[in-house]
């Protein structure tokens, strides 16, 4: 077992010397021995709660992490932080809390580690914003760290087919259109979510789980095993052991997360037809380490990456199927073979990506993952857009779309509720471009996801017949011609705020353009008449967020990151 010089670790501030006798008394009160207190302290943070199935299995896995830490010479210190689960927050004001929770999770993890002087960190997360949040905290603190996903939910079974919660969201649209009875809707909702774990398709949680392996912060294969399976405890135990190895070798998150590894992460998102939210989270992670990696940098990777994974919502299969087919490492291997992955990036194994992938072979007998030279489509499932309607950019998920160009007339709504009411009453028509504005990071505040609205549109059979544009976000589960992250946002006087009903909009996902048929002078004239809307929040966390949040194309950061860092926590 390795020996550690505690005099060189942050925890010396809470455990060494006569003046720290009161601190040590607290540890003895919790059952730790003098030997335990003399060892490195490892924070074990999870986002466990009972809000939804996504995080319900995390406390169990945390116990296995702690066993791994102790077995390798460390003293684990478990703590929980919050999470807001999008599936519950969706479709009402609660969704304003979702993206904000990313910052609170990262900040609270930072404060806990700083306040108690932990030497290393293992983070376990199971829902959309908690995954990037813990990765952000890791690179911000820069103590040796390992991320581990809590695992995906098992698919439900309805009429002999695999289903996920997204089928229920879309069934709401079918029900409102008279295409599904209340009895059938109830049958579906009762079977769609049969276990613990995050939503089962290639939605945001599973997208960011793939990112955790591709970026190098998680152990190979750890993203794939479903939450209910005992194999998750094996990876949790190994993660606890791994973080101690990283501490011994002084391999830190900023040695792992680099421009190249961020490009690897964007590549896995594109290859899996993953969530557009990754284009928000990767720039936010980059901000923590002072790297410029914005929405359009992500989009460049998306444009040149083949789409290889036939996963829901654009494809046929769920996360469990990808795991059985060969998991993230097999997909990374074929991408590496095709020259799409940087092999020289360090990972938490203490080896490079190339070394990790050395003995992995592609299995051609499965149907979920394609080889790099036999893609579902030659470019990624997500495309960046720019034009006079989105000078800072926007993003659209094209995985599963049959048509990549759309021209139509604007139907403008100043919040999601107004748009949803229109959709529920079916007061829109084929060819409309539904605009949902004032839902950006500042305007929302909180940049809500629009799954309830897009799910209802798709359920009504209109998913390919209309387009939707917003300065808000979309769930990773969204289907249809939906453009999000449009900036500058309406609340800041961006072009979305200047649109009127009937304005003609052209979207071309092949060329990567999004424009309204208005001249510069017409837009300028409208801008002179525009007046900012008063926020519906004058105090509290949501108000505070709106005062500090940056633009979506930079990841909606709430602090300057490493650019203005004076000293990093790990070196205190």
Swiss-Prot record:
It catalyses: (2R)-2,3-dihydroxy-3-methylbutanoate = 3-methyl-2-oxobutanoate + H2O; (2R,3R)-2,3-dihydroxy-3-methylpentanoate = (S)-3-methyl-2-oxopentanoate + H2O. Signal peptide: none annotated. The active site is at 475 (proton acceptor). [2Fe-2S] cluster binds at residues 54, 127, 199. The keyword Iron applies. Homodimer. Belongs to the IlvD/Edd family. This is Dihydroxy-acid dehydratase.
């Amino acid at each position: 077992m390795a020996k550690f010089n505690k005099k060189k670790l942050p925890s010396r501030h809470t455990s060494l010397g006569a003046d720290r006798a009161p601190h040590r008394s607290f540890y003895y009160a919790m059952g730790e021995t003098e030997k335990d207190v003399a060892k490195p302290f490892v924070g074990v943070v999870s986002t466990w709660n009972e809000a939804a199935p996504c995080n319900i299995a995390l406390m169990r896995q945390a116990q296995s992490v702690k066993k791994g830490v102790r077995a390798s010479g460390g003293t684990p210190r478990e703590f929980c932080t919050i999470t807001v689960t999008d599936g519950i927050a969706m479709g009402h004001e609660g969704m304003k809390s979702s993206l904000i929770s990313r910052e609170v999770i990262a900040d609270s993890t930072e404060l806990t580690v700083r306040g108690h002087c932990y030497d290393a960190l293992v983070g376990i997360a199971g829902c959309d914003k908690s995954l990037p949040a813990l990765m952000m905290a890791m690179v911000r603190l820069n103590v040796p760290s390992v991320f581990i996903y809590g695992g995906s939910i098992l698919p439900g079974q309805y009429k002999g087919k695999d289903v996920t919660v997204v089928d229920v969201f879309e069934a709401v649209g079918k029900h409102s259109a008279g295409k599904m009875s209340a009895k059938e809707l109830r049958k579906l909702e009762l079977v769609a979510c049969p276990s613990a774990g995050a939503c089962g398709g290639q939605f945001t949680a599973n997208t960011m789980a793939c990112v955790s392996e591709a970026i190098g912060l998680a152990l190979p294969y750890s993203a794939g095993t479903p939450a209910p399976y005992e194999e998750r405890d094996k990876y949790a135990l190994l993660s606890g052991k791994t973080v101690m190895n990283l501490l011994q070798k002084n391999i830190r998150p900023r040695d792992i997360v680099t421009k190249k590894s961020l490009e690897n992460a964007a590549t896995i998102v594109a290859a899996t037809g993953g969530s557009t939210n990754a284009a928000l989270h990767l720039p936010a992670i980059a901000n923590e380490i002072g790297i410029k990696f914005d929405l359009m940098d992500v989009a460049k990777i998306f444009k040149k990456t083949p789409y290889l994974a036939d996963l829901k919502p654009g494809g046929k299969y769920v996360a469990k199927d990808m795991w059985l087919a060969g998991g993230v490492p097999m997909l990374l291997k074929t991408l590496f073979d095709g020259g799409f992955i940087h092999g020289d990036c360090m990972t938490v194994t203490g080896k490079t990506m190339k070394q990790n992938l050395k003995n992995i072979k592609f299995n051609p007998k499965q149907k979920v993952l394609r080889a790099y030279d036999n893609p579902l489509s030659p470019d990624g499932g997500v495309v960046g857009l720019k034009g006079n309607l989105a000078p800072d950019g926007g993003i659209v998920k094209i995985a599963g779309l049959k048509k990549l160009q759309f021209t139509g007339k604007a139907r403008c709504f100043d919040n999601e509720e107004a748009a949803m009411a229109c959709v529920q009453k079916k007061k829109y028509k084929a060819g409309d471009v539904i605009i949902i504005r004032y839902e950006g990071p500042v305007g929302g505040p909180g940049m809500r996801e629009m799954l309830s609205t897009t799910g209802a549109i798709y359920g009504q059979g209109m998913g390919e017949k209309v387009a939707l544009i917003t300065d808000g976000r979309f769930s990773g589960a969204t289907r249809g011609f939906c453009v999000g992250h449009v900036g500058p946002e309406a609340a800041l006087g961006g072009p979305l705020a200047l649109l009127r009903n009937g304005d003609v909009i052209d979207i071309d996902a092949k060329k990567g353009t999004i424009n309204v048929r208005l001249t510069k002078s017409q837009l300028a004239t409208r801008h002179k008449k525009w007046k900012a809307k008063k926020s519906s929040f004058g105090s509290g966390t949501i108000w505070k967020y709106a005062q500090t949040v940056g633009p979506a194309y930079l990841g909606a950061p709430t602090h300057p990151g490493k650019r203005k860092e004076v000293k990093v926590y790990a070196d205190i």
